[in-house]
Amino acid sequence: MVMSKKIKEKCKKIDLVLTDVDGVLTDGGMFYSVSREELKKFNARDGMAVELLRRNGVSTIFLTKDDSKVSKNRAKKLKAKIFFGIKNKEKKLSELCKSMKINPENIAYIGDDV
């Protein structure tokens, strides 16, 4: 899949996408198997978007409050970094800007709790 010129132009300033997991990459629901294993439903289209971003030089980082093995596995599959157990996402954003030398205006954040 190739990014259209129109979308590419709009995204020129974006160097990094930060996204929450629960409620953004999932529907917010939690499922448990009979053995009490946590399960989450991820949308395949979101995975395709992360792949498309990577192919076009835009990294994706997952920021999540939870410490879910399921979320870690999803990040690994999509070759995205994940920071879990993050209670203060604004503080983590500031830390990432400094460590990665990225201006906040060059970051797209997708979340339901900031």
Label the model's feature ranges.
Residues 50-74, 83-84:
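Substrate-recognition element of Asp-dependent hydrolases with the DxDx(T/V) motif
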Residues 93-114:
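Conserved Lys-Pro-Asp/Glu-containing loop-to-beta segment of HAD-superfamily phosphomonoesterases
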